[in-house]
UniProtKB/Swiss-Prot annotation:
Catalyzes the rearrangement of 1-deoxy-D-xylulose 5-phosphate (DXP) to produce the thiazole phosphate moiety of thiamine. Sulfur is provided by the thiocarboxylate moiety of the carrier protein ThiS. In vitro, sulfur can be provided by H(2)S. Belongs to the ThiG family. The active site is at K96. GO terms for molecular function: thiazole synthase activity. This is Thiazole synthase. GO terms for cellular component: cytoplasm. Homotetramer. Forms heterodimers with either ThiH or ThiS. It is found in: Cytoplasm.
Length: 262
């Protein structure tokens, strides 16, 4: 069990609800993932669902904690307004804060992000800020009152994995008491393992499951990957060595010679 913004959870995998081939694929993938937290966008929720069933009705059946996001916002004002709508609509003070500053790589706009985070925290929100792995930006968000940081592993939807493990490792070292969740760029279960081996608290992903040939099966793979990575970190992995070291201690006389000489 772990604590995320006051909620006790078993799963360290958070899953998005966009881009699935159908509502059935989404529901099965979320079920297989074991996640207890799903992200949802205001714009996506207000659109009609597939197969005659509204998206919102499908989401309610999942019985997960909702993490609404401010996807599509490009300045603090828009993000704050969207967050207020989400709080009223979904009855939650959680908000995944996204303020995009570039169309090419969907990188967050740092100045507007910090501004929005500060205002939303003052208004009683629990802010989950989508940010880069920039140490100074993350420090400013913490100074603004963020107890959670969600740095990217790589640009959204790229599937490139962790493009700067050193920066992420530095964040873990510098913010030991902050909840760190990788958000964006994860493409393979092995990427999720790597995240958790760095000591991160969780992984949030969407595209890697939604666009897989078999979303439900991929969700299962990510479920096990996150567990394996976390257990590896908790178990204490051996340090790398520059030279070989025998795993079996050697003695002067082979054991079968010792037996024959008895």
């Amino acid at each position: 069990m772990w604590n995320l913004a006051g909620k006790k959870l078993s799963s360290r995998l958070l899953l998005g609800t966009a881009c699935y081939p159908s509502l059935e694929h989404m529901q099965q993938a979320i079920h297989n993932s074991g996640t207890e937290v799903i992200t949802i966008s205001i714009k996506r929720q207000t659109s009609a669902g597939l197969d005659g069933e509204s998206f919102w009705q499908a989401v309610k059946k999942l019985d997960c904690h909702l993490l609404p996001n401010t996807a599509g916002c490009r300045n603090a004002e828009a993000a704050i307004n969207t967050a207020e709508i989400a709080r009223e609509l979904f009855n939650t003070h959680w908000i995944k804060l996204e303020v995009i500053g570039d169309d090419y790589n969907l990188q967050p706009e740092p100045f507007e992000l910090i501004k929005a985070a500060r205002i939303l925290i003052d208004r009683g929100f629990e802010v989950f800020p989508y940010c880069t792995d920039d140490l100074v930006l993350c420090q400013k968000l913490v100074d603004a009152g963020c107890k959670i940081l969600m740095p990217w592993g790589a640009p959204i939807g790229s599937g490139k994995g962790l493009i700067n493990p050193y920066a992420l490792e530095t964040l873990r070292y510098r913010f030991p008491d902050i909840t760190l969740i990788i958000d964006a760029g994860i493409g393979k279960p092995s990427h999720a393992v790597q995240v958790m081996e760095l000591g991160f608290d969780g992984v949030l992903l969407n595209t890697a499951v939604a666009l897989a040939n078999h979303p439900a099966l991929m969700a299962t793979a990510f479920r096990h990957a996150v567990i394996a990575g976390h257990q590896a970190f908790t178990g204490g992995m051996m340090s790398e060595r520059n030279v070989a070291h025998p795993s079996t201690p050697l003695i002067d006389t082979p054991f079968w010679h010792q037996v024959n000489n008895l």
